[in-house]
């Protein structure tokens, strides 16, 4: 394990030095950057192909898990989704409404709910914060938020402010901890959830998988448990996206 960590650290140092060397090469760095850009595009296509067939593999793995753990696993997933949905509904209806009242009083509350439905529906149907961004910015403007504030806060929030994802990370950690009867403190659960959400939020493709891998690694579980978290991510995707999108809207209002 020590040798493996040392090797990873050495590779990281090599790529940092390589990046600095490219940056210092000025005009001659363009061919290298073009090669790296092309390689990045190929890798992204490769990941897309894998993710296209991933549902088949996940279905087979889920069937295997049910065979091993029995109905308790299915009940665990159902319970996780139900509790997560209740938490999302509480934040969506109660917490965000309180923010709207604090910011604008009764008129702010009315104006908020008059315009928040379109981005919510878009988020629910697309499961994509990026796809919901244009209609989200437009809704924020109708709430009285200036275009400068709404465009900047919502654009940044799409990458770095994800209420639904953070809550989802907490539930993923709690599910694993209960499944394997592991003792983990509340502080550690919250810390890992924040790191798993914020540190990989700018990753354009495969960010969710990286987040789940980070959770597993920090908890000390084997990578074979990754599909377990992937299934949770799939079933909570829609409500999580709604919370991510509307959280950015109320942030721009604030």
PLM regions and their residue ranges:
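Signature of multi-pass transmembrane helix bundles
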Residues: 1-111
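Loop-to-transmembrane-helix entry motif
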Residues: 6-7, 39-53, 77-85, 116, ...
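Transmembrane alpha-helical segments of multi-pass membrane transport proteins and ion-pumping complexes
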Residues: 11-15, 20, 24, 53-56, ...
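Juxtamembrane helix-boundary/capping and inter-helix hinge elements in multi-pass membrane proteins
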Residues: 25-30, 38, 69, 105-108, ...
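Small-residue-enriched core segments of transmembrane alpha-helices in multipass membrane transport
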Residues: 40, 78-95, 113-120, 187-200, ...
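Membrane-water interface of transmembrane alpha-helices in multipass transporters/channels
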Residues: 71-79, 106-114, 182-190, 221-228
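Helix-loop-helix junctions within the multi-pass membrane cores of secondary transporters/permeases
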Residues: 118-197
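Transmembrane alpha-helical segments and their short flanking loops
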Residues: 170-254
């Amino acid at each position: 394990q020590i040798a493996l960590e040392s090797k990873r650290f050495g590779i990281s140092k090599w790529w940092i030095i390589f990046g600095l060397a490219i940056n210092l090469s000025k005009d001659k760095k363009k061919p290298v950057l073009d090669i790296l850009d092309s390689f990045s595009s190929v890798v992204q296509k490769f990941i897309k192909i894998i993710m296209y067939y991933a549902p088949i593999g996940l279905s087979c793995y889920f069937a295997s898990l049910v065979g091993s753990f029995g109905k308790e696993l299915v009940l665990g997933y159902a319970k996780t989704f139900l509790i997560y949905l209740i938490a999302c509904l509480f934040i969506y209806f109660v917490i965000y409404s309180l923010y709207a009242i604090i910011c604008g009083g009764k008129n702010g509350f009315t104006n908020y709910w008059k315009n928040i439905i379109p981005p919510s529906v878009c988020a629910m149907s697309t499961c994509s914060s990026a796809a919901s961004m244009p209609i989200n910015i437009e809704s924020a403007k109708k709430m009285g938020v200036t275009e400068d504030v709404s465009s900047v806060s919502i654009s940044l929030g799409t990458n770095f402010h994800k209420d639904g994802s953070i809550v989802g990370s907490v539930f993923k950690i709690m599910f694993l901890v209960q499944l394997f009867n592991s003792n983990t403190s509340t502080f550690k659960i919250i810390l890992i959830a924040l790191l798993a959400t914020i540190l990989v939020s700018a990753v354009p493709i495969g960010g969710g998988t990286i987040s789940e891998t980070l959770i597993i690694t920090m908890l000390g579980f084997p990578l074979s448990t990754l599909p377990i978290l992937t299934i949770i991510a799939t079933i909570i995707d829609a409500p999580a996206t709604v919370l991510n999108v509307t959280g950015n809207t109320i942030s721009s209002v604030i």
